[in-house]
Amino acid sequence: LTDVDDKTIRDSRKEGKTLKDFTEYYTEAFFNDCDALNLERPEHVTKATDYVQAMIGFVKTLVDKGYAYERNGSVYFAIEKFQEYGKLVGLEHQDFKTNADGRLQDADEYGKEHVRDFALWKAWTEDDGDVYWDSPWGKGRPGWHIECSVMSTDKLGPTFDLHAGGVDLKFPHHTNEIAQAEAATGEEFAKHWFHVEHLIVEGEKMSKSAGNFYTLRDVLEKGYNGREARYLLLGTHYRSMLNFTFEGLEATRKTLERIDDFLLRLQEADGPDDVSGEAEQAEKAFDEALEDDLNISGALAAMHELMRGVNKKQPSKESARKVLETVYGFDDVLGLGMKDVKRGSLDEKVEKKIKEREEARKKKDWATADKIRDELKGQGIELMDTPDGTRWKKAK
């Protein structure tokens, strides 16, 4: 958690809050959203403000090795000293036309040797208020890029397997992370990079001015739930832009209803057909999709193909259990709460009504059967007549 940077300092002062109070509010909101989406909590959650002394030590190492220099109380990384700078995005040194931090120079950056050098340590200014730490270069605070490199290498070591982030962070942020980390340690920083594409709304970039800016809370307040939002997000490959629409959420809701109905049918199955072969084929297709650049959308397609195949048959109890185990295994990856889908308990009066309707249907007394159906619908119970008998669910 980068709980100290230009934006958090600026916005906390604007709201008249301490940096700690301001960032803790948004940290709590972030984890509330994670819970709503059924995201597992990380093993370690680090805050930049807890690592400032380690960052100062990291910057000193870069200065001592000749990769960084001090100007007017700030410390900058000398890009020209790191020959592999830009390798993540395929840049050559002659391609550097602008400042590597991707912004115009701030007032405290006029002393840089080269316009493309980026700040490792920023000297204190009046705009920082009471946010500063003492360092060998005077009062100041860490730059944004150094925070991530120091925290990740502290918990994972100088080299780790996978570094994730939005596609917009490839340059300059991740590029700068690689440069400062590898210059300091002399080792490869991350073996693999996982860059996630943007989410757009109704085919356009999200923006408050366009009136199409939505948070997860906005979606939940419109009556959708985190499970539906999660499924929608899973449905697009991470390398592809996700076009968010409320029509898409409605379709997702119906898809999840079909999945739940499928699971309930399996739990009650007692037919003649062996569907264990379909389960084995689906497991293979699901795993192959995941091994193909984490193709979750392909894995979902494998699950739906399984549903289509099984729904054409009347599964035996034993093979239905096999299919359930397979789908629950899928859910260990998907996190859609499928193991929690159970038939709710009905009170005796409702159960009696369902049995009465079944008797009426056997006698071909359709008028009575329809009357009971409508009566139960008024109580929030929706009936479904299937080849395996009458099933029910709570109406939306």
Language-model features: locations:
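Residue-level preference for long, well-ordered alpha-helices that form the structural scaffold
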Residues: 15, 19-23, 51, 248, ...
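Short Gly/Ser/Thr- and Asp/Glu-enriched loop/turn motifs at secondary-structure junctions
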Residues: 41, 71-72, 385-389
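N-terminal, positively charged nucleic-acid-binding surface of large information/translation enzymes
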Residues: 1-38, 389-392
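Alpha-helical recognition segments enriched in aromatics with Gly/Pro capping
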Residues: 1, 31-32, 53-267
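Aromatic- and histidine-enriched alpha-helix N-cap/loop-to-helix transition segments
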Residues: 50, 143-147, 294, 298-301
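Structural preference for alpha-helix termini/caps and helix-kink/transition segments
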Residues: 205-206, 212-396
